């Protein structure tokens, strides 16, 4: 037991005037007053720790909640029809047919990944995997959305190296394929990298588990790793000023605020959980992530039909002398908390022993509506659990469109010099594909295992990852994640919809049907009215877009305070779209050359839209103007036609157009198929606009010559604009833009793939 004096409920009642460090714990005066009002006394040290972490921005969504409600307001019953679990659960769950369900979610681990890039990224992966486990599913794949400072900035190499190794090291050790993502470099992320991790899992519909504690007398079992001092960063006053000393030593002060992960413990924990689920030994379950036991106990109790009592000293600890507040606040990784009926406890413990997973009975569900926690026989917590988990402060922060927004929008690309000659067009292409903005991410993705477990059908560099779910029927899922901070800075409403449109389109080009959305909303300080305007507009854009497309937001995450001083990151709403494909054998690949002599057809309208584009960034260091127009009805039409084409075998390859426009799409598709092609520019077209415009709602498809008439006829009948844009010449080893220039595949590959190894290799 700690030598630290125990601040009990009795002591707190008897000493109402004791000064407490609530401000150091991040609580405001009115929040502290509200806690005292709820309890009818001052909180104990342990209670103060619980409320401070659970009422933090990260856990309570106190600045975003009023805006996030809009997702619910715009989601119809029809949109919810296939959703088995949604916002408020550990992760969203969608019925994908044939008795299968998929759960998926995106979470951020941004700030820890700057402080300690390897562990920050690794534990970000571990945390989202446990969210998926807690729903009753087997995790099957991960993805990542990464944002770093300028590629040539001094500190970027440190952060990139650690984050990429952390994502790969943890995911690879778990045996989970990393099937895609995005990596963006921009100076706004210097000091504030974004590490957003997605995990997806599968289960039979009847195996869904939720986080709740019900049934008086049911036992609370903590299982997994021991509880240590790592991750008590948010509760800084509970730990020390230094990182020195052994965790178990008497002179220890504080370990780093960043959690330390052990993927091998988590891998065993996954198998243990799945066996517990299969044996029907779990009533309710919650993973221990942010806020640790404070979160797990209060959320389980709040969601149940009674109260809960915890004997905190029973928690297995790996550090001596821990206080009750430290045990409650620890964010040690690889831990789960389950509710188990008394008659099943022995069987539960036996399964854990089989997998060599430490499991301890730490309490039970009680009658009543209180969460009580004792520490060596003395009560240190006695609270209504809903007040901790769900009834924290809710702020309607000031929302104000920044005065600088008008000037930003007015600063268009109209006056920027454009390439005109064939040589200038070729030089522009080579410069753009070599830029950190568009170059190959192969140096990153090769550090990830993309095909472990044998169910990966498509992965990076495809537009979306495709995973087989059912080996007998071939049923699978497609997942894509997208975001554009540049477009969102120009117009947050449109920027969020452009991210949604691209992720939706990336799923559709594989031949899958988009079904559901998750998100991770990364913004600056909520105390800045301009940031809150960006956030409000992005939420509304995303929600309205999902309503138009008829797919629900199943859950997500908000990350605020991503800024250095007064400089915020580019507003970055990350959107993940889940699609379902009936048979992964009919998925549409990215690479050209599958069929000899394919015709290249460009679907959609190409307009002179360069504001916010990668061309304006790479060639001119420019950001301003109005983003490309979003047409979500067109996106739905594209998806419908690609689905029909996939089922009928009308297209042999497809690749969406986004950053870098047609030129980037052609280069990527040609290199993926190791096949050259000729691009035939329309007679009346501006070569620069045709090659580099970033107009939305476009897809490049390769069509076998025998199916061209049938495919184009289908597009014409559905009023989808199309133009024959080129041919794939059998045996070609170059990309030729007819009448302009030609570049060999060898030069394209060297240029495209050489940048990141030169910077970070």
Swiss-Prot record:
The protein's Enzyme Commission number: 6.3.5.3
Pathway noted in the entry: Purine metabolism; IMP biosynthesis via de novo pathway; 5-amino-1-(5-phospho-D-ribosyl)imidazole from N(2)-formyl-N(1)-(5-phospho-D-ribosyl)glycinamide: step 1/2
Subcellular location: Cytoplasm
Record-level GO BP terms: 'de novo' IMP biosynthetic process
Binding site for ATP: 61, 105, 519, 556
Binding annotation for substrate: 108-111, 130, 259, 331-333, 559
Binding of Mg(2+) 2, residues: 131, 287
HAMAP family cross-referenced by the UniProt entry: PurL_2
Lineage: Bacteria, Bacillati, Actinomycetota, Actinomycetes, Mycobacteriales
A Pfam family annotated for this UniProt entry: AIRS_C
PANTHER family referenced in this protein's UniProt entry, alphabetically: PHOSPHORIBOSYLFORMYLGLYCINAMIDINE SYNTHASE SUBUNIT PURL
Keywords: ATP-binding, Cytoplasm, Ligase, Magnesium, Metal-binding, Nucleotide-binding, Purine biosynthesis
Major localisation: cytoplasm
GO cellular component, one term: cytoplasm
Function summary: Part of the phosphoribosylformylglycinamidine synthase complex involved in the purines biosynthetic pathway. Catalyzes the ATP-dependent conversion of formylglycinamide ribonucleotide (FGAR) and glutamine to yield formylglycinamidine ribonucleotide (FGAM) and glutamate. The FGAM synthase complex is composed of three subunits. PurQ produces an ammonia molecule by converting glutamine to glutamate. PurL transfers the ammonia molecule to FGAR to form FGAM in an ATP-dependent manner.
Annotated source species: Rhodococcus opacus (strain B4)
Annotated Gene3D superfamilies: PurM-like C-terminal domain (3.90.650.10), PurM-like, N-terminal domain (3.30.1330.10)
Binding-site positions, Mg(2+) 1: 107, 557
InterPro entries (UniProt xref): PRibForGlyAmidine_synth_PurL, PurL_linker, PurM-like_C_dom, PurM-like_C_sf, PurM-like_N, PurM-like_N_sf
Family: Belongs to the FGAMS family.
Assembly with partners or alone: Monomer. Part of the FGAM synthase complex composed of 1 PurL, 1 PurQ and 2 PurS subunits.
Catalysed reactions listed for this entry: N(2)-formyl-N(1)-(5-phospho-beta-D-ribosyl)glycinamide + L-glutamine + ATP + H2O = 2-formamido-N(1)-(5-O-phospho-beta-D-ribosyl)acetamidine + L-glutamate + ADP + phosphate + H(+)
Protein name: Phosphoribosylformylglycinamidine synthase subunit PurL
Catalytic residues in the record: 58, 109 (proton acceptor)
A GO term, aspect molecular function: ATP binding
């Amino acid at each position: 037991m700690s030598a630290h004096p125990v601040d009990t409920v009795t002591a707190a009642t008897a000493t109402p005037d004791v000064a407490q460090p609530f401000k150091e714990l991040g609580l405001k005066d009115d929040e502290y007053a509200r806690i005292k009002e709820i309890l009818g006394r001052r909180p104990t040290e342990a209670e103060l720790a619980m409320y401070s972490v659970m009422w933090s921005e990260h856990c309570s969504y106190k600045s975003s909640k009023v805006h996030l409600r809009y997702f619910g307001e715009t989601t119809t019953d029809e949109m919810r029809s296939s959703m088995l679990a949604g916002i408020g659960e550990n992760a969203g769950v969608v019925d994908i047919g044939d008795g299968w369900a998929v759960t998926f979610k995106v979470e951020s681990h941004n700030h820890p990944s700057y402080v300690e890039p390897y562990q920050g990224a690794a534990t970000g992966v571990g945390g989202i995997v446990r969210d998926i486990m807690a729903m009753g599913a087997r995790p099957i794949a991960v993805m990542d959305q990464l944002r770093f400072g300028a590629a040539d900035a001094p500190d970027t190499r440190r952060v990139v190296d650690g984050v990429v190794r952390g994502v790969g090291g943890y995911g690879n050790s778990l045996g989970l394929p990393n099937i895609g993502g995005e990596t963006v470099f921009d100076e706004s992320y210097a000091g504030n990298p974004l590490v957003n991790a997605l995990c997806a899992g599968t289960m039979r519909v009847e195996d869904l588990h939720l986080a709740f504690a019900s049934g008086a007398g049911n036992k609370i079992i903590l299982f997994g790793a021991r509880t240590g001092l790592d991750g008590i960063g948010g509760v800084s006053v509970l730990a020390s000023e230094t990182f020195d000393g052994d965790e178990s030593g008497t002179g220890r002060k504080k370990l780093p605020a960043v959690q330390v992960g052990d993927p091998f413990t988590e891998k065993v924990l996954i198998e243990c959980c799945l066996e517990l689920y299969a044996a029907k030994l779990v009533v309710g379950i919650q993973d221990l992530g942010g806020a640790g036991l404070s979160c797990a106990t209060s959320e389980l109790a709040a969601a149940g039909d009674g109260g809960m009592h915890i004997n905190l000293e029973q928690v297995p600890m790996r550090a001596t002398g821990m206080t009750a507040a430290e045990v409650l606040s620890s964010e040690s990784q690889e831990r789960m908390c389950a509710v188990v009926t008394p008659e099943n406890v022995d069987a539960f413990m036996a399964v854990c022993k089989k997998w060599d997973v430490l499991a301890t009975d730490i309490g039970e569900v009680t009658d009543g509506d209180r969460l009580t926690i004792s520490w060596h026989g003395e009560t240190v917590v006695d609270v209504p659990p809903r007040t901790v988990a769900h009834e924290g402060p809710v702020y309607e922060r000031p929302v104000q469109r920044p005065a600088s927004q008008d000037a930003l929008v007015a600063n268009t690309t109209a006056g920027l010099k454009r390439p005109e000659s064939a040589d200038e067009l070729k030089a522009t292409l080579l410069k753009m594909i070599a830029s950190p903005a568009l170059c190959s991410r192969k140096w990153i993705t090769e550090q990830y295992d993309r095909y472990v477990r044998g169910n990966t059908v498509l992965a990076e560099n495809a537009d979306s990852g495709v995973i087989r779910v059912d080996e007998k029927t071939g049923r699978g899922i497609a997942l894509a994640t997208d975001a554009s901070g540049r477009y969102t800075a120009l117009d947050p409403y449109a920027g969020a919809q452009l991210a949604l449109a691209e992720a939706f389109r990336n799923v559709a080009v594989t031949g899958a049907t988009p079904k559901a959305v998750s998100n991770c909303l990364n913004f600056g300080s909520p105390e800045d009215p301009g940031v809150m305007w960006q956030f409000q507009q992005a939420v509304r854009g995303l929600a309205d877009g999902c309503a138009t497309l008829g797919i629900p937001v199943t859950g997500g995450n908000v990350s605020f305070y991503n800024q250095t001083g007064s400089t915020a990151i580019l507003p970055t709403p990350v959107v993940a779209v889940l699609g379902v494909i009936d048979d992964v054998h009919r998925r549409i690949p990215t690479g050209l050359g599958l069929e000899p002599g394919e015709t290249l057809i460009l679907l959609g309208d190409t307009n002179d839209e360069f504001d916010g584009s990668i061309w304006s960034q790479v060639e001119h260091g420019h950001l301003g103007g109005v983003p490309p127009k979003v047409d979500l009805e067109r996106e739905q039409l594209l998806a419908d036609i690609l689905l029909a084409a996939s089922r009928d075998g009308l297209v042999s390859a497809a690749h969406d157009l986004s950053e870098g426009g047609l030129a980037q799409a052609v280069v990527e598709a040609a290199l993926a198929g190791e096949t050259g092609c000729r691009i035939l520019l329309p007679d009346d077209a501006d070569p620069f606009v045709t090659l580099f415009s970033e107009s939305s709602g476009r897809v490049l498809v390769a069509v076998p010559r025998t199916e061209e008439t049938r495919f184009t006829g289908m597009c014409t009948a559905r009023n989808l604009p199309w133009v024959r844009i080129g041919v794939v010449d059998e045996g070609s080893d170059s990309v030729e833009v007819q009448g302009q220039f030609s570049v060999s595949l060898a030069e394209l590959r060297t240029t495209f793939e050489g940048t990141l190894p030169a910077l970070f290799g």
